[in-house]
């Protein structure tokens, strides 16, 4: 009888201890171990326990999407330099998935980080501009294409002859987004002036996830070969922002995705709502709606400052028009002789920032895959304003309209799509 009682007590004790262990962090760490997964992967863990099991280095689970999320607390909210390190840090912190859309790659550190992430079980999807894969990809693009299981690469081409996939987006564990002007290249890293913003608010992240999925289903597998030339409007309308920043009687969308969102017209509308100031910088400039809005703002007494890359501006009829209308206009290059002023952002009334991959061109609005994100986060807006102030203090003003000497040498068609199809300086990265 005593033996039976001892047995019952022993069983009850084991059950209590097991219950404690199953609800402890030690159990989550144990079940997260790769060896546990390999040898005991067929064990059915109850949903209430399974949902709490994070992946390696994970700190929380997103219940809405039921996936593990890495610790991104050390990833800065924005940056203007060492942008390759920011992307690598975000990749290294990822534990479940990484989705990327990129225009150009020739540096190895980000591909290295993506391959290492794949090797630890992270699912990688990459969309690359069609014309950077065909007819011959760069070595680093080829590495990703040939990386094997766990990294899937697709290509995407804009419409007409001029459209490109110009986004520079990464999405990590469906939890944070990086975007901005930064391509994964030597020039962008060491010679250009660039920016990157990091989005952690769910409203932004969800929008970018939808945009990526929208692009992914339209992108071509490598086995499908290069894309043919496609007509304007072929892709339809991308996901639209359903949340807004209300300011000056206007609903500023949280984001704008191209092609198909009339982005240049909506940016012009935003400029029309400015009451005190418009500070704008772009790499290339051919959008008449934006140029007209800038001139209207200046003529109604708004404090306008416009900045463009010097080589691109000299061949821009819209830049020349601003100058001739008296709009305060400056130009500058990059960090060195090979570099560019590659930023593309606008600050309205020192309150609203719009930044992303979108150059102020009709092509970017109509034919290319682009993104613009808007925020009224005062810390971020002020950081960009401080950076713009520094840029503007370092830039110079044209001495006469004659300095826009590249304009007269361009065909009208090239003027419309300036910067997206013509390389005026073989040493300078275009777009």
Kindly label every feature range from the protein language model:
Residues 2-25:
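Classical Sec-dependent N-terminal signal peptides that target proteins to the secretory pathway
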Residues 12, 418, 428-431:
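N- and C-terminal low-complexity/disordered segments
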Residues 27-94, 104-272, 300-388, 403-404, ...:
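HKD-type phospholipase D/PLD-like phosphodiesterase module
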Residues 102-103, 282-283:
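Glycine- and other small-residue-rich loops at beta-strand/loop junctions that grip anionic moieties
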Residues 106, 110, 286, 290-293:
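Secreted/periplasmic proteins that engage bacterial cell-wall peptidoglycan
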Residues 219-225, 394-413:
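Charged phosphate-binding loop/patch that engages nucleotide di/tri-phosphates or the phosphate backbone
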């Amino acid at each position: 009888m005593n033996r039976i009682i001892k047995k019952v007590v022993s069983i009850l004790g084991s059950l209590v201890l097991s219950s404690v262990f199953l609800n402890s962090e030690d159990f989550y760490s144990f079940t997260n171990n790769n060896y546990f997964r390999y040898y005991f992967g067929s064990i059915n863990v109850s949903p209430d326990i399974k949902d709490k099991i994070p992946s390696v280095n994970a700190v929380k689970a997103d219940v809405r999407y039921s996936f593990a999320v890495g610790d991104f607390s050390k990833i800065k909210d924005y940056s203007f330099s060492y942008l390759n390190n920011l992307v690598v840090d975000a990749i290294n912190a990822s534990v479940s998935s990484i989705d990327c859309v990129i225009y150009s790659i020739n540096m190895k550190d980000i591909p290295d980080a993506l391959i290492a992430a794949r090797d630890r079980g992270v699912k990688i999807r990459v969309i690359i501009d069609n014309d950077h894969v065909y007819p011959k990809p760069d070595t680093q693009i080829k590495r990703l294409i040939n990386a094997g299981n766990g990294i899937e690469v697709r290509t995407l081409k804009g419409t007409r002859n001029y459209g490109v996939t110009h986004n520079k987006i990464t999405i990590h564990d469906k939890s944070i987004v990086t975007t901005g002007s930064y391509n994964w290249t030597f020039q962008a890293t060491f010679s250009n002036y660039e920016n990157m913003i990091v989005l952690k608010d769910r409203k932004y992240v969800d929008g970018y996830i939808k945009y990526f999925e929208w692009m992914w289903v339209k992108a071509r597998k490598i086995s499908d070969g290069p894309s043919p030339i496609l007509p304007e409007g072929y892709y339809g309308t991308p996901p639209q922002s359903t949340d807004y920043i209300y300011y000056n009687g206007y609903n500023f969308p949280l984001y704008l995705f191209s092609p198909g969102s009339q982005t240049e017209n909506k940016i012009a509308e935003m400029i029309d709502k400015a009451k005190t100031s418009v500070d704008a910088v772009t790499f290339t400039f051919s959008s008449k709606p934006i140029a007209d809005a800038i001139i209207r703002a200046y003529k109604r007494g708004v404090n306008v400052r416009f900045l463009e890359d010097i080589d691109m501006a000299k061949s821009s009829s819209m830049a020349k028009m601003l100058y001739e209308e008296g709009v305060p206009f400056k130009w500058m290059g990059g960090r060195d002789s090979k570099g560019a002023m590659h930023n593309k952002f606008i600050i309205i009334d020192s309150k609203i920032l719009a930044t992303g991959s979108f150059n102020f061109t009709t092509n970017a609005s109509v034919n290319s895959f682009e993104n613009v994100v808007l925020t009224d986060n005062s810390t971020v807006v002020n950081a960009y304003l401080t950076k713009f102030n520094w840029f503007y203090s370092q830039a110079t003003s044209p001495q006469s309209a004659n300095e826009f000497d590249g304009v007269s040498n361009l065909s009208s068609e090239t003027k419309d799509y300036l910067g997206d199809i013509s390389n005026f300086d073989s040493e300078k990265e275009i777009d």
